[in-house]
Amino acid sequence: DHDRAQAMYERAIDADPTDADNLGNYAIFLKNVRHEYDQAKAMYERAIEANPNHANTLGNYSQLLFATGRDKTAIALVTRALPLAGTDEKPLVAECRFYLFAHSPEHRRESGENLRDLLAAGVTTGSWSFEPNLERLRREKDPRYDLVRDVADALSSGDTQTLESRGEWYAL
């Protein structure tokens, strides 16, 4: 029940208004479940204020910013998140690299190479959704949409067969 979940997030934040994990998780809920992007933005900003070095929050907030076309700010956040991600946070690194691959021409080649290495090492992001990013590329009629969608699918499933059949994946 989404209403009960929201009430629980709000109680947790009332109990500790500076807990970056609670603020960031509530922002994810607002973005992914409620589709309340302005409120999610406010929660992400509170979470970053509470802990400016919280790699997961920086990465998640960058998705919202990239999906809504605020690339310059998103690039700043995601490039901050990458060196902060721990060695055990390879899925987070893959997520951040995906956003740069999808939305930043300046970072595309390096991020594509990193994604190839991560996928070859068996790193996946599981059920994490890249749909907001794919929707933006669809809306903009980006010619790389099919490739980026295949990268998202490979990150979710670990199956790189479709991706490996794409010449442009290796031509990065």
Language model features with spans:
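Register position in tetratricopeptide repeats
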Residues: 32-33, 67-68, 99-103
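Conserved small-residue packing positions in alpha-helical repeats and bundles
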Residues: 27-28, 62, 94-103, 132-136, ...
